[in-house]
From Swiss-Prot:
GO biological process, one term: ubiquinone biosynthetic process
Residues the entry annotates as binding Fe cation 2: E96, E148, E180, H183
The entry's keywords: Cell membrane, Iron, Membrane, Metal-binding, Monooxygenase, Oxidoreductase, Ubiquinone biosynthesis
Textual note on the cofactor: Binds 2 iron ions per subunit.
Top enzyme class: oxidoreductase
Purpose of the protein: Catalyzes the hydroxylation of 2-nonaprenyl-3-methyl-6-methoxy-1,4-benzoquinol during ubiquinone biosynthesis.
Residues at which Fe cation 1 binds: E66, E96, H99, E180
Entries under Gene3D superfamilies matching the protein: 1.20.1260.10
Membrane topology term: Peripheral membrane protein
One annotated Gene Ontology cellular component of this protein: plasma membrane
Pfam families to which the protein is assigned, alphabetical: COQ7 (PF03232)
Organism: Ralstonia pickettii (strain 12J)
Pathway assignment: Cofactor biosynthesis; ubiquinone biosynthesis
This protein's name: 3-demethoxyubiquinol 3-hydroxylase
Amino acid sequence: MLDRFIPEFDRALRAVAGVTRASRPNPADAVIASAASTNTADNATKLSEADRRHAAGLMRVNHVGEVCAQALYQGQALFARDPAIRTQLDEAAREEEDHLAWCAQRLQELNDRPSLLNPLWYAGAFAIGAVAGRLGDKISLGFVAETERQVEHHLDGHLDTLPEQDTRSRAIVAQMRDDEIRHGDNARQAGGIDLPAPIRQAMRAASRVMTTAAYRI
């Protein structure tokens, strides 16, 4: 357990501090490349102040979501009983690190900041992940599947409300959505069970609190 705790603690510090590095190219970079190849301007640089604030609020919410994803996966992996399940959770967490780095970069580009409450979000999510992990792999995987289903719905909403001209944010969110769908599918295929309705409803309520606060703070 101690052998896993040390690297997980390091990962936690990096997630909260916002110093993670992506292992994959940022999807937003393709927007710049496309604009350059066609000699067109990147419209994401022409956002009105209202659109900039709205896009930054949504990307801050997404950044918080990725901080929470790191914590959830780390808490679950720490108590996973099947080594194969632990490996699957670790691999998903590494992809979520990409999302975290992309969102952090986009917030900088929008001249905004991450949530001031990130340490609180991380601590709460880690505790939830650890409890899910202690309840057994099937429940833990079911929690992953339900979380990713709700995140997919949440990202769909962001794609509906992000400014059309903010092509960089939209590219990041679209790739995140594809990854989250795959993570949820993998969890179900690995044996994740459907969670009871009261738990799903509690998860949605907690998500609403987080997204409302993170949009502003």
